[in-house]
Design a protein with these regions (language model features):
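Conserved two-metal-ion catalytic palm core of "right-hand" nucleic acid polymerases
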Residues: 1-129, 151
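Conserved polymerase palm-domain catalytic core
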Residues: 22, 96-194, 198-199
Length: 199
């Protein structure tokens, strides 16, 4: 990663001028990934892209993806969103537990289901994700770029944990589960942080 930063810094003006031109002419193609493992809190494969691709994704996520894809989210989808996060999610869970306790005659008798999706990022189906993205991203150029990013790994299944866009894509992928639990099944006490959820 540091070598790719040095290469871009060495020709910064050329690189900055090249990115918009490639995006406008639809000649931009995401490069390859460098893979490594992190071990906190558990062993995870991280795939990081080039510095040039990080610039594209950062701008794309901040200017397009975030606003377009987070609009349909429920309040109790806590991950990777402005004004939310782990503390927001924990506060909501605490409030739900207190409300349940009061509504049930100050009895703590009840159950909480806590679950997660095993190997979540690695199990996301690109074909399903692209259909979900297309529901909310209507500009054809932006949709084409999103699909390029989704398809940019050599693996036929999954999205890289190291991409900024993967955080937003992963939140969207389980959005239908959120709406099913909250609206159709009417689970008041439901919340999700990425692939971890409780009922």
């Amino acid at each position: 990663w540091k070598n790719s930063v040095a290469k871009v810094e060495a020709s910064a003006l050329e690189a900055v001028a090249l990115i918009p031109r490639e995006l406008q002419t639809r000649t931009y193609r995401p490069g390859g990934y460098r893979a490594f493992y992190v071990y906190e809190p558990k062993r995870r494969l991280i795939q990081t892209n080039s510095f040039k691709d990080k610039i594209v994704q950062h701008a794309f996520c901040d200017q397009v993806l975030y606003d377009a894809l987070t609009k349909p989210f429920i309040l109790d989808n806590y991950g990777s969103q402005v004004g939310k996060g782990t503390h927001f999610g924990l506060n909501r869970l605490r409030d739900f537990m207190r409300e349940y306790y009061r509504k049930n005659g100050f009895s703590a008798d009840g159950w909480v289901l806590k679950a997660d999706v095993r190997h979540y990022f690695q199990s996301i189906r690109p074909d399903v994700l692209k259909k979900d993205v297309a529901k909310y991203l209507h500009d054809p150029d932006c949709l084409a770029l999103a699909c390029q990013i989704i398809d940019s790994t050599p693996d036929p299944l999954g999205i890289p944990i190291g991409n900024q866009s993967s955080q937003i894509f992963a939140l969207l992928y389980l959005n239908q589960l959120d709406h099913l639990c909250k609206e159709q099944l009417r689970f008041r006490y439901y919340g999700r942080y990425m692939d971890d959820f409780y009922i």
